[in-house]
Amino acid sequence: MAELIIVYFSSKSNNTHRFVQKLGLPAQRIPVDNRPLEVSTHYLLIVPTYAAGGSDAKGAVSKQVIRFLNNPNNRKHCKGVISSGNTNFGDTFALAGPIISQKLQVPLLHQFELLGTATDVKKVQAIFARLKHHTHDKQKQTNNLITERTHPCHKPMRHTSH
């Protein structure tokens, strides 16, 4: 199977971290400090939302996530985004997800509140499994295509004149 991991950001409150731990899936955390993280495999991004609510969407995506996604290599491996938020903030609930989805042109796969529920955990595990299977199928198709084009028995046909 093609490798797929969870990449996530969690502030010092660790709400997102606790949610990711419940998933029981391979994961890498975007550092809270300024240390860079570079990912070389496909991943599903899980991020919290930081926004004041109402019409104030400033800062919805954390600086650490922005810095991570400013790396072209990291951007190209993102296969989808999941975001968390607090429904008390109304229109800005889980807003980081739609923002990142639009910027990266990847699907917004799920949104959940705070620590998430058992149902959220099951949904994200199912999304991960489907995405991993889909990524595997695409990789298999690509490998078959490469094999078909580069196999030594596949030589160009020569035209001979009589």
UniProtKB/Swiss-Prot annotation:
Q: Which InterPro entries match?
A: Flavoprotein-like_sf (IPR029039), RNR_Ib_NrdI_bac (IPR020852), RNR_NrdI (IPR004465)
Molecular function terms from GO: FMN binding
Q: So which domain of life are we looking at? A: Bacteria
Record GO biological process: protein modification process
Its transmembrane ranges are: none
Report the family membership. Belongs to the NrdI family.
Classification via HAMAP family: NrdI
Summarizing the function annotation, the protein's role is: Probably involved in ribonucleotide reductase function.
Q: What is this protein called?
A: Protein NrdI
Organism of derivation: Streptococcus pyogenes serotype M1
Q: What is the lineage of its organism?
A: Bacteria, Bacillati, Bacillota, Bacilli, Lactobacillales
